[in-house]
Curated annotation (Swiss-Prot):
Catalyzes the condensation of the acetyl group of acetyl-CoA with 3-methyl-2-oxobutanoate (2-ketoisovalerate) to form 3-carboxy-3-hydroxy-4-methylpentanoate (2-isopropylmalate). Residues 393-513 are annotated as: Regulatory domain. Mn(2+) binds at D14, H202, H204, N238. Belongs to the alpha-IPM synthase/homocitrate synthase family. LeuA type 1 subfamily. It holds the Pfam family HMGL-like. The keyword Transcription does not apply. It comes from Dechloromonas aromatica (strain RCB). It is found in: Cytoplasm. This is 2-isopropylmalate synthase.
Amino acid sequence: MKQHLVIFDTTLRDGEQSPGASMTKEEKIRVARQLEKMRVDVIEAGFAAASPGDFDAIHSIAQTIKDSTVCSLARANENDIRRAGEAIKPAQSGRIHTFIATSPIHMEKKLRMTPDQVVEQAVKAIGWAREYTDDIEFSAEDAGRSDLDFLCRIFEEVIKAGATTINVPDTVGYNIPSQYAETMRQLIERVPNSDKVVWSVHCHNDLGLAVSNSLAAVLCGARQVECTINGLGERAGNAALEEIVMAVRTRADVFPVETRIDTTQIVPASKLVSQITGYPVQPNKAVVGANAFAHESGIHQDGVLKHRETYEIMRAQDVGWTQNKLVLGKHSGRNAFKNRLQELGIELESDEALNAAFARFKELADKKHEIFDEDLHALVSDDLVTPDQEYYKLVYSRVCSETGEMPRASVILNIGGVEHKAEADGGGPVDATFKAIESIAGSGAELLLYSVNAITTGTDAQGEVTTRLSKGDRIVNGNGADTDIVIASARSYLNALNKLHSTLDKVKAQGGV
């Protein structure tokens, strides 16, 4: 009988540390619900001590999620662990994930602690965590560059103290598969009582080896993999959940483990995270890329038509790919709209939220005749912005553009109940619109990224715009969608400005695995 492989998703914590990928509480809850629907075992909902906003989001997710363990990260100090324990208190199943660095360079340069002090602090951390839960994970930050003998020593002590999961992170993505697998094998072999805990891996993708390293460790005894949707994460990202899960499932002949993941929810989760964070999925991305099941070669096409398994090792529908289909139109009623949202796994909090979304749907249906599932996802994402998060609100936008003349934009913004109007010229209609908005907002933010993607096919398709703004040490992504690209751009820019302004934005606590 195959052993269970725990899937630990850290999209909401490590994934959110990607530049500009910070999410609101409502967005985090929406992602957490999708992860629960996908049957993820553990959801790392955030870093409770990082900010009041992070604490609140974890606490809300702990109240909402019933079928997955809700986890908070915490440094190995009493305050962090207390905040984590309070945040996960409402959870039906809660975990505290505490960590301390163990590599020589981290202990000396960052912690300024001796190895003995690090071991002592780690043991204390487990004791503090046990006051809140029996499910305690310990991570040795930068284990990939740590001395093996020291890892054996610290893991032995934290297991004695009550840790139930031992995580061996390759924090900077330094290891190669054979090396990482051997580390895992030796740890399990040498650490006393290693059979009493779950051994976990957390790999970063700096050398493009996060998934390979994780799978190599699974073959050597790891029974938890920490990963993120789309491989989202700081620097080059983390191990991609979809690749780990499908590798284990597709190569069941090789891996002695199985997961409980509902793989048909993988693509919906990928699209949701991409939409919320503003990080597009590259077309050739394994499993969830737009081209993952596309065949251009005539020889390949002929083979697939004759027998799918000639060139496909997975079925597209098994990971949640479906053909775009017309689902609703301008004559569709509120109940049909509500039912389709439920089929897509989209839950709105109240009748007021449903009414607002339905009103936006009717506006969209007047602009384009065919409404696809992707349109509904984009529409609901726009409606997740609550009034207290919408300091800047677009009231009116107009652009005059003609051949040989510089475009001129006119915008009206509502700021705190007061309308402000401005006009500006620009190198194009979008440039003019952004300049008009800035002449009112005066944010001083720097535009780092502007990108447009068609949500569906056709000339009447909605354009989904992502903007990335930087101000000081803060980077945020904004999203907006509309059949009018200029309006979508304005919404995206204002969405980013509102995130910069929002009191929910936070300064991340330093550290992480």
